[in-house]
């Protein structure tokens, strides 16, 4: 079989631990035998981020901007324990947060559904897609650990140096902590447009929730800008497509999502989306069964698996044990990036390969070959075996070869 040509590269962002191992296995077993893979490689492993003082992360973000498409492996965001383990000079920032801030995009996360795995929320018949604003809020916050009594103030000075606002946050009588968050109208507007455009492309309603009754400036701004974009730019198209936009308080939206049939785009502020995407993944099946794509306003796409580095499997694998790690989300990340490259370049063969890659993985799982994470969710009668990584990828490759020759 002649390899599929890929003249234009994508940015490849490698990562850490077990997902790094699986990353290489997927490339070598499922992609390189069939595609003349063309990537610009960036090593975002924690040791290399330490070596480059995290410059490699900024370089990777610029590559995604330039090439329009990137695919990213899961990476470690270090805490104090990881700093000691890896001998880090400092606690480097989350690569995801850095890249999201650089691209100023929206993260869309949707579960990969299997007929054999029933969702915890039994009324869900279709996927719930989380649209997470990927800028600002907690992830760009400024914090201060208050040592003792004193006053914390929120001050705004305009570009000419004139003080426009000074508000007391709190008069501390003892130690405490203070935090200041921000966002930009331009980023919120692009977030809204990304959500409505994506929803139109997949034919789903948009639900958005915030807490404007309490946050009468911050959350109210989100609410008003969403409504403005919808009314002025998308309402006619939504009505023509038979779709709807719904706003409610975040707690009300959360309750309504759990009672819905699914098939909605749930727009969330940054922190809300971080939490709710994992909740939706767990309720749908398993976190390794969650796709993720970051879409920027200027048409850049970054695909990744919406899970961590699977540290426990890595430690076991390093001891020589055979492990059973779910590869589907990582496979879907590669497939998504290759498909988008093919769509942008008019490369029909690459688009077809991407669909076959996804289908091959689904077919093997639907045949009852489950990974460790899924066996814990099902009755033993629901699956036939629990193959290790090498065996599972071999089964998927055989199925992929069949699909490509049909």
Give a label for each model feature.
Residues 36-41, 202-210, 234-246, 342-354, ...:
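Flexible, glycine/charged-enriched surface loops at secondary-structure junctions
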């Amino acid at each position: 079989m002649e390899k599929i040509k890929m003249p234009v590269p994508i940015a490849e962002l490698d990562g850490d631990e077990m997902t790094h191992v699986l990353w290489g296995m997927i490339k070598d077993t499922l992609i390189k035998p069939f595609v003349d893979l063309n990537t610009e490689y960036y090593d975002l492993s924690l040791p290399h981020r330490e070596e480059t003082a995290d410059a490699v992360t900024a370089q990777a973000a610029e590559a995604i901007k330039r090439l329009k498409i990137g695919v990213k492996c899961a990476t470690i965001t270090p805490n104090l324990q990881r700093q000691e383990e890896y001998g880090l000079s400092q606690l480097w920032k989350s690569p995801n947060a850095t890249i999201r801030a650089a691209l100023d995009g929206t993260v869309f996360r949707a579960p990969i559904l299997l007929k054999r795995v029933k969702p915890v929320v039994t009324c869900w018949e279709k996927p719930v897609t989380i649209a997470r604003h990927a800028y600002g809020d907690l992830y760009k916050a400024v914090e201060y650990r208050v040592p003792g009594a004193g006053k914390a103030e929120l001050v705004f000075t305009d570009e000419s140096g004139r003080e426009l606002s000074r508000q007391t946050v709190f008069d501390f009588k003892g130690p405490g902590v203070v935090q200041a968050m921000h966002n930009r109208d331009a980023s919120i507007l692009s977030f809204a447009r990304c959500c409505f455009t994506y929803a139109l492309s997949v034919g789903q309603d948009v639900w958005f929730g915030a807490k404007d009754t309490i946050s009468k400036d911050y959350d109210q701004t989100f609410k008003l800008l969403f409504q403005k974009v919808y009314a002025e730019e998308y309402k006619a198209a939504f009505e023509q497509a038979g779709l709807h936009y719904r706003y409610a308080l975040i707690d009300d939206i959360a309750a309504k999502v759990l009672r819905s049939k699914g098939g909605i785009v749930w727009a969330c502020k940054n922190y809300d989306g971080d939490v709710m995407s994992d909740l939706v993944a767990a309720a749908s099946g398993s976190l390794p069964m969650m796709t993720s794509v970051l879409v920027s306003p200027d048409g850049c796409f970054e695909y990744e698996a919406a899970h961590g580095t699977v540290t426990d499997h890595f430690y076991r694998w390093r001891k020589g044990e055979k492990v059973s790690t779910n590869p589907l989300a990582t496979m879907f990340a590669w497939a998504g990036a290759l498909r988008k490259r093919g769509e942008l370049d008019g490369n029909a063969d690459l688009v077809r390969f991407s669909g076959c890659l996804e289908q091959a993985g689904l077919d093997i799982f639907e045949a009852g070959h489950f990974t460790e994470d899924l066996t814990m969710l099902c009755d033993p009668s629901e699956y036939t075996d629990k193959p290790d990584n090498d065996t599972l990828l071999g089964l998927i490759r055989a199925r992929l070869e069949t699909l490509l020759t049909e």
